Amino acid sequence: MVSQTPEAEFRVTYKGEIPSVHLPVRLSVLEAVAFKTTCQQIFSGTTIPSEIILDFNQTTFIDSSGIGALVSNMKVARQKGSNLVLRRVNPQVMAVFALTSLDQVLTIEQPAPNANSTETHHSKDHQLPITHPSVRSWVKRLIDIVGALVGLGITGILFLPIAIAITIDNPGPIFFGQTRCGWMGKHFRIWKFRSMCVNAEALKSQIKNQASGAIFKNDNDPRITRVGRIMRKTSLDELPQFWNVLKGEMSLVGTRPPTPDEVERYEVPQWQRLDVKPGMTGEWQVNGRSSVRDFEDVIRLDLKYQQNWSLMYDLKLIFKTIAVLFNKNSGAV
């Protein structure tokens, strides 16, 4: 017997004790919040179902907020001993799952009718959602490529003296790689010149966080080397990120690239900042990056960038960044 619960945020039907949540055509921030609320209502019941069916038959658009709600619900389901089963997922949504590697961890029952893996593979780039105009701007991408090539040329010139300074000050690797979250939450490896001691990541838990929310900051972080402080003051440590820009993982201008542990603490609306590519610079960089200590301020600046974005706005932020680099009050990200 199939029954319907009218009080749910989304339409929920039951077949026996197994609920099916019917998702809407679009799964962006407002719908994503409602999606999370709907699943919370199911999980707060007296009996936790062994599985929850998520019917994606109507859904053709999902952005980073939708991904955030799905990830959040998946974690709660596992904590409750339940499982989310995705049914009738359209190729557009499957392309997003493939981009973010969620197709590796989600239980997907079956593809949408008439969708085959070969077709999806060849057209997945065209099926990815346009979460923000900057994502599909070929002019912005051209500026990124030209800027990255120029930046890598400068990096090549400065590489030897920087490498020698790093090695003399604190022997170890020249480069530091760290997993960050890019567009739609996709993981990528960001590169910098190493500005901290070799075992910096292992020592992070021992350092006091002077910021509030899902960011980490400490003005006197003891892990930073002497040469590292100079590089951070001048942003020389970030020169290798031009490689990330050239690969398309980052942009010259965008939002601050968060770490996975930061993203794990996001509420659904905060995932909106992942609707654009992360950038080497952005609003947070030109508005006193070292003085931004509240995560809500980071969100505000990132959303301001998304709302005001244009090619001229990007160029304006690039020139502002150059000015900030010569400001003695600038600081490390």
Residue ranges and their predicted role:
Residues V2, R273-V333:
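C-terminal terminal-structure detector
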Residues F176-R223, T281-V298:
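Short, glycine-rich, amphipathic interfacial segments at transmembrane boundaries or analogous
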Residues A112-L149, I174, R289-L311:
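Glycine-rich flexible loop motifs, especially short His-Gly-Gly/GGXG/HXGH segments used as catalytic or interaction
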Residues L86-E119:
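Short, non-transmembrane cytosolic segments of multipass membrane proteins
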Residues S134-A202, L317-V333:
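A hydrophobic, helix-centered structural microdomain
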Residues Q40-D63:
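Short, glycine-/small-residue-enriched flexible loop/hinge segments at domain edges that mediate gating
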Residues I215-V276, L317-L325:
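A short, structured surface patch at a secondary-structure boundary
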Residues P6-T37, F56:
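STAS-typified acidic loop motif
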